[in-house]
Amino acid sequence: MSYFPWLTIIVLFPISAGSFIFFLPYKGNKVIRWYTIGICLLELLLITYAFCYFFQLDDPLIQLEEDYKWINFFDFHWRLGIDGLSIGPILLTGFITTLATLAAWPVTQDSRLFHFLMLAMYSGQIGLFSSRDLLLFFIMWELELIPVYLLLSMWGGKKRLYSATKFILYTAGGSIFLLMGVLGMGLYGSNEPILNFETSANQSYPMALEILFYFGFLIAYAVKLPIIPLHTWLPDTHGEAHYSTCMLLAGILLKMGAYGLIRINMELLPHAHSIFSPWLMIVGTVQIIYAASTSFGQRNLKKRIAYSSVSHMGFIIIGICSITDTGLNGAVLQIISHGFIGAALFFLAGTSYDRIRIVYLDEMGGIAIPMPKIFTMFSSFSMASLALPGMSGFVAELIVFFGIITSPKYLLMPKVLITFVMAIGIILTPIYSLSMLRQMFYGYKLFNVPNSYFVDSGPRELFISICILLPVIGIGIYPDFVLSLLGDKVEDILSNYFQR
């Protein structure tokens, strides 16, 4: 048991240390980069140290708990704590943000603000995953929006203002529903707001009210995850954002929606979840097929990868809605797995664009000969994305399959039908992945493009790719590494579920 405020330091350190960036020399790009990477590495070491020494894997209860009164007027507390569900996403956040900062090395325009915004996102993401208070959860959720909007609108492509505006309209619209759900749950049945997760978990609501709260939270998560039809901001955003921002979006931002769906909707509103889950299961199944089919029709490389992300999110939805130990484990494993694979694919797409200055697949071809290292890495991560055995994507999707097959909630025929449609989705994934590889790397197309230089991956880019590839293969070979972090938390969620 540690009484040292580890989580408060871990949450506040990136944004606090990041604010000193503005005191660094305006033209000292190298100093700014090393300073930011130093903060990210130190934060990752802090997270690893705190978790290794003070986190008990066999304890499903909240650990490293902190509770400080913040605003007396409406009994608002700074409540932090972690359990098996939040430890994986926090470690993923630390790892991907550090590599995204290294990936942002070529950014020289307003680099002080750029790196500060990345560190502000870092704090917001870790704050959200370790929050134990509904209002604090909402504040951390909102803390993400402004940095992402600015990163998009200032360092994006030609249509950056359009995609940034679309992003803020969608996510801010979803946040209104999130706030209504938070305030509704906090103020129900009491003169004083009850915002902490522990009390809310034991609170029972009238059925109609619980469905209303569930729906409010669901809309917010459906935008962030995204769930169709609220997904259209994602391809536009990924198509225009700088690839280091894409790494954070695909690696962490989308996972916040899935985390919220488990942490609040599943844990705090179980009756409504059992009503909504069959419908969400259908949506998740349709999403896998729809996004995989749409991805195949995309000319833009980054948009094709973005639609593949939407397709993979369908597996997370199905895992969460199976309401089984296996399915939920598979969903969390897919959250971690896709965090690595999605970030790597966007990074490689961005570095390829830096060299050839072409985004449309039908204009590419023959890149494998001048750039064999990029070709090798891109092929490896495409294989991971299409769930090649031995890679993390395969294990995650397989566990989700077992989860839906063994679910006692559904009858045999719906289970067979959903499994069959999911299998079609898995067949469609290699079609768009391998087609993307063929269009980019094979053939003998000559590039008549001014200012294009065919330089293969440098040491920095190779280092980032290998750093992401190692956990992808590691989890694929030994998934218990992630599943053991969950410990008894999944059983704990489901046991509360069936008791109530």
Curated annotation (Swiss-Prot):
It is an enzyme of class 7 (translocase). InterPro entries: NADH_Q_OxRdtase_chain4, NADH_Q_OxRdtase_chainM/4, NADH_UbQ_OxRdtase, ND/Mrp_TM. Keywords: Chloroplast, Membrane, NAD, NADP, Plastid, Plastoquinone, Quinone, Thylakoid, Translocase, Transmembrane, Transmembrane helix. One of its GO terms (molecular function) is ubiquinone binding. One of its GO terms (biological process) is electron transport coupled proton transport. Its EC number is 7.1.1.-. This is NAD(P)H-quinone oxidoreductase chain 4, chloroplastic. It comes from Ceratophyllum demersum.
